[in-house]
């Protein structure tokens, strides 16, 4: 067959299979569509907090904020929403990813991003609002535009600070803010960043600058350990806890609703058991829920299915490695992992002696590892007569013993 024709037929067959699943498209895109808030995964209460912070800052009461939550909870998506919400209002907005840099390198990145994201167009011309300052702006831009990963030697920190101050106080409209969005801010919680955090003590008090940092639940504690005064500079904490079960169901429902063909039922093509499995296993983490649903749909398309049941969801979780069992395996040391895998090969339970013989290791070594795994709650102990049997938890049984069954589809 002609390769072009083959590709065209494959593409049209996917559209047909998608239709059988009662979907117009796969609504579980993990990457947020920039500027599209239809697939928002957070809560209205979090948006309200951000709105209040922005409103207060516009009236002179600037309070920098940390957006904290576990991996995959939607912190980057929240920064994305702040970016577009504030950009539409005409504020200057700068997106940065935290890294271990000196204050001077941070200032250079900030200055460059302010210029390229707010003042200079993609074609390299200055926006009409700022033409009266064109000479000085172009001078800054020329110094920074070609530096790449190198720090321009001819641009001392004092001059950078003066140029930044000039942009904020003279070029930016006085009724607008300069909003700095910093993702993965845990990178700053290192001793090598002490000088940068000390610089933040004064910088985060600058008038007209509002900063949002996103990081793990322990972000503020970790930053404060390195530099105690930083706590006062970031007084607001927006906590993003995992979704409740109801919120998890709602997230899936909202996404499906948008993609359904006419006549589809609430959670189609997922069965009730499949949805329940996703909600139970994904711990309220939006990224896990979205990835599992997306992978399940991909498997269903590949196999020409019309329904997605619990078996398909298990296969999706297996291929993604995001079930609770997989998380436990990732947490174990190689020696501990070897022992639980051996237990699975022995049917899910074994004595110290059986494992020692099977793995050809001393009973004392096996016993030490088993005690550690037992203390973590990943295996259980049961006495049968004179013997003590160690048994895999349900989560480990599902992933280690259920693997073969799951893949025979």
UniProtKB/Swiss-Prot annotation:
SUPFAM superfamilies the record matches: P-loop containing nucleoside triphosphate hydrolases, Winged helix' DNA-binding domain
Q: Which cysteines are joined by disulfide bonds?
A: none
Task: Determine the domain of life of the protein's source.
Answer: Archaea
Q: Which SMART domains match?
A: AAA, HTH_ARSR
InterPro entries under this entry?
AAA+_ATPase, AAA_16, ArsR-like_HTH, ExeA_AAA_ATPase_DNA-bind, HTH_ArsR_DNA-bd_dom, P-loop_NTPase, WH-like_DNA-bd_sf, WH_DNA-bd_sf
**Per UniProt, which keywords does this protein have?**
DNA-binding, Transcription, Transcription regulation
Location of the HTH arsR-type domain:
305-409
Listed GO MF terms: ATP hydrolysis activity; DNA binding; DNA-binding transcription factor activity
UniProt protein name: Uncharacterized HTH-type transcriptional regulator MJ0774
Organism per entry:
Methanocaldococcus jannaschii (strain ATCC 43067 / DSM 2661 / JAL-1 / JCM 10045 / NBRC 100440) (Methanococcus jannaschii)
Its lineage reads:
Archaea, Methanobacteriati, Methanobacteriota, Methanomada group, Methanococci
């Amino acid at each position: 067959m002609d390769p072009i024709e083959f590709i065209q037929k494959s593409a049209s067959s996917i559209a047909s299979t998608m239709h059988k699943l009662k979907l117009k498209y796969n609504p579980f895109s993990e990457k947020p569509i920039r500027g599209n808030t239809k697939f928002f995964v957070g809560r209205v209460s979090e948006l309200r907090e951000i709105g209040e912070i922005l409103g207060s800052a516009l009236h002179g009461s600037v309070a920098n904020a940390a957006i904290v939550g576990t991996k995959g909870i939607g912190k980057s998506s929240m920064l994305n929403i702040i970016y577009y919400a504030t950009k539409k209002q005409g504020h200057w907005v700068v997106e940065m990813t935290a890294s271990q840099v000196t204050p001077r390198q941070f200032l250079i990145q900030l200055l460059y991003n302010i210029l390229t994201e707010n003042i200079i167009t993609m074609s390299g011309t200055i926006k009409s609002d700022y033409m009266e300052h064109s000479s000085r702006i172009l001078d800054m831009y020329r110094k920074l535009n070609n530096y790449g990963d190198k720090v321009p030697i001819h641009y001392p920190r004092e001059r950078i600070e003066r140029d930044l101050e000039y942009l904020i106080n003279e070029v930016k409209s006085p009724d607008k803010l300069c909003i700095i969005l910093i993702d993965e801010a845990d990178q700053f919680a290192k001793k090598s960043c002490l000088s940068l955090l000390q610089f933040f003590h004064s910088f985060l008090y600058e008038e007209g600058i509002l900063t949002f940092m996103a990081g793990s639940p322990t972000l503020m504690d970790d930053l404060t350990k390195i530099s105690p005064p930083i706590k006062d500079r970031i007084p607001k904490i927006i906590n993003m806890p995992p979704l409740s079960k109801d919120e998890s169901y709602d997230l899936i429902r909202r996404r499906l609703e948008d993609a359904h063909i006419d006549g589809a039922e609430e959670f189609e093509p997922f069965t009730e058991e499949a949805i329940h499995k996703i909600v139970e296993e994904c711990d309220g983490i939006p990224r896990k829920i979205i990835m599992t649903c997306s992978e399940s749909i991909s498997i269903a398309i590949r196999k020409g299915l019309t329904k997605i049941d619990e078996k398909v969801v298990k296969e999706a979780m297996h291929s993604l490695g995001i079930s609770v069992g997989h998380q436990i395996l990732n947490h174990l040391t190689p020696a501990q992992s070897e022992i639980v895998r051996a237990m699975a090969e022995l049917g899910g339970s074994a004595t110290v002696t059986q494992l020692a013989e099977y793995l050809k290791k001393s009973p004392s070594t096996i016993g030490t590892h088993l005690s550690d795994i037992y203390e973590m709650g990943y295996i259980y102990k049961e006495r049968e007569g004179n013997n003590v049997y160690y048994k895999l938890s349900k989560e480990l049984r599902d992933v280690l013993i259920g693997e073969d069954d799951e893949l025979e589809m």
